């Protein structure tokens, strides 16, 4: 190490040629907002010189391109990209995302601590710097059947792992506010480490209590007033723009040069089609700027503010002594990524070739018995008021609606005129269980859509206008050992297998992307009006997001944290 420090000193002083020089860049100064012409000298994986001219063993001609720090995704579930972390690395790093903070919460709900073992090992095999936050709430609640339970004692062996930052989104915010002993044990075990938050709509004294527990970041703010209260109370708000949860438009007015130290970006859940068609954090940055956010504020949020919030003090700026994560842009406002340097290495296809790939665990994890059409019958009287999950497009928050539905032979049925169809969740972790209900807002006129991605316990979820097609879709999911299925007329119209824990494919990114096109098209032929139907299905079972959800145990009134009778 002393020899490496000596090399950095010599190269920074100009006494030796730098390992790498990026020549003729215009550096975005995150302190002043200026675009400053300069070379950038790199020794190993560290920047050693800026604001001058340097000689290097290797030279990249920037040709007046704009140099900005590498982007940091502050909270995501790589599983939601449906691909392995190695494929995620290959396809997202070229978008300028040089650091990702991964909560393997989805895998953990299926596999328990084996998910941490896999995530931590895989994070050593990627060119992107992937840091892991340990999933704090597995299961999220006791209102569903999960594949695992993780307590404070299970987290402790991973606390001091060099790839671990702390614990991930603390979803049991009522438990924190009420000083639940299990929550306190986890918070105490990770005192002094980063504790990430998850507190939708929490405010006032409840938010005071939550922040006082040492929780410093939150990505669940969906409105500017909510986000402002959180940053005023010392939290960093992670502005989320995923494939379903789209909060950027609502929060963009809050992101100014003055507030940018307290705001960062995250994707949470982003699928391969959106990555391919729109991008990743580069999409968030250009969208924010288009919405009126000053470019300096947007790029600060994407780098320096993110690094500061998570204690990653070795990155976030292009400055001597900082990690050489550098993005060269053709256009600042369009965030047009031309070239990426990650840890001092040029991002090229050769960078990913020949890397070790630890096999992903979790095959054979879908343990559910076949179902029949009659299993989806819901008792009810004609004209009786029924609780219905109301989908809010672009949100994972749902409404608790009370609607009159038709019934025949003692069973309530779909009402297509009101855009109401059935939804069911089937237990998949080896124990029987099935919750049934109704949902409004999918636009389905026929058929069924099913998914083994069902936050957070990842039981099987199906939305459908026909009981027989719902059975076809679920039974095909079981045969595939997880995935997405669209069925109508008694046949499968489109499918994608996700055999890794029922969550991820072992195929290349491009193959998964291409398989999603016919799935979306098949959903549209059923009448589905939602732009991302599969992730929308996946969030219907999430009983920690208001207001009405469904699990394998039935409908959940999230506001009261209880099952409906």
UniProtKB/Swiss-Prot annotation:
A Pfam family that the UniProt record links to this protein: Adenine_deam_C
Organism domain of life: Bacteria
Record GO biological process: adenine catabolic process
GO MF annotation list: adenine deaminase activity
EC annotation from Swiss-Prot or TrEMBL: 3.5.4.2
Class of this enzyme: hydrolase
Disulphide linkage map: none
Reaction catalysed by this enzyme: adenine + H2O + H(+) = hypoxanthine + NH4(+)
Keywords associated with the record: Hydrolase, Manganese
Cofactor: Mn(2+)
Record-linked HAMAP family: Adenine_deamin
UniProt family annotation: Belongs to the metallo-dependent hydrolases superfamily. Adenine deaminase family.
Designated name of the protein: Adenine deaminase
Native source species: Methylobacterium nodulans (strain LMG 21967 / CNCM I-2342 / ORS 2060)
